[in-house]
């Protein structure tokens, strides 16, 4: 039995609320159970120097956690003078994941910056961030379309992410903190709306896992991502 009493293939309660920040070109408040992330998408008419003159744009991401997003206060990274390795890893993952869904040439020579700020953390902050970031990105693209800033479609499709793990010997979907901290294995899957894989991160925390166990996790992830994509489509409709 999972601590949350969910079925092995059951997501937490998920909500995707679009347009929550009036100043941003795109925004989304995403909730996976008690994990809440505020995501904004900012359009910038500038590019990294190494991309200038190439006729294509860029999508990048930044990620951070509020000090009391966690059970005990976490020191702000700004006060330490540098970002932690985990933060850098997650924001690069978010950027890579979103670029897989974007036609950068159709975007033109401009940049969209995604900011993911974790308000409350209860496991799965990176997967919630990616899922909500796609909604904020789509919101931003629609903002651009409404102003005739785009000549062609920019988004190739949906991108969503979900965690899976082996908890008490059972493959389960969408781990919360209680499960993640005790799981034998945990993995994060980033996929397209068609179920194609963008990235997989998997670790045997306690016990190495077999091919069959990995395939069971991937099957769960595909089901979970399909549900998340349905919610994304409803959010941007």
Curated annotation (Swiss-Prot):
GO molecular function, one term: tRNA nucleotidyltransferase activity
GO biological process: rRNA catabolic process; rRNA processing; tRNA processing
Residues where phosphate binds: 86, 124-126
Source organism, top-level taxon: Bacteria
Pfam families associated with the record: RNase_PH, RNase_PH_C
Catalytic function, reaction form: tRNA(n+1) + phosphate = tRNA(n) + a ribonucleoside 5'-diphosphate
E.C. number: 2.7.7.56
Transmembrane segments: none
Top-level EC class: transferase
Cited PROSITE patterns: RIBONUCLEASE_PH (PS01277)
Keyword Metal-binding annotated: no
Family annotation (InterPro entries): ExoRNase_PH_dom1 (IPR001247), ExoRNase_PH_dom2 (IPR015847), ExoRNase_PH_dom2_sf (IPR036345), PNPase/RNase_PH_dom_sf (IPR027408), Ribosomal_Su5_D2-typ_SF (IPR020568), RNase_PH (IPR050080), RNase_PH_bac-type (IPR002381), RNase_PH_CS (IPR018336)
Keywords noted in UniProt: Nucleotidyltransferase, RNA-binding, rRNA processing, Transferase, tRNA processing, tRNA-binding
Family recorded in the similarity comment: Belongs to the RNase PH family.
Subunit text: Homohexameric ring arranged as a trimer of dimers.
The protein's role, per its UniProt record: Phosphorolytic 3'-5' exoribonuclease that plays an important role in tRNA 3'-end maturation. Removes nucleotide residues following the 3'-CCA terminus of tRNAs; can also add nucleotides to the ends of RNA molecules by using nucleoside diphosphates as substrates, but this may not be physiologically important. Probably plays a role in initiation of 16S rRNA degradation (leading to ribosome degradation) during starvation.
Protein name listed in UniProt: Ribonuclease PH
Provenance organism: Nitrobacter winogradskyi (strain ATCC 25391 / DSM 10237 / CIP 104748 / NCIMB 11846 / Nb-255)
Annotated gene: rph
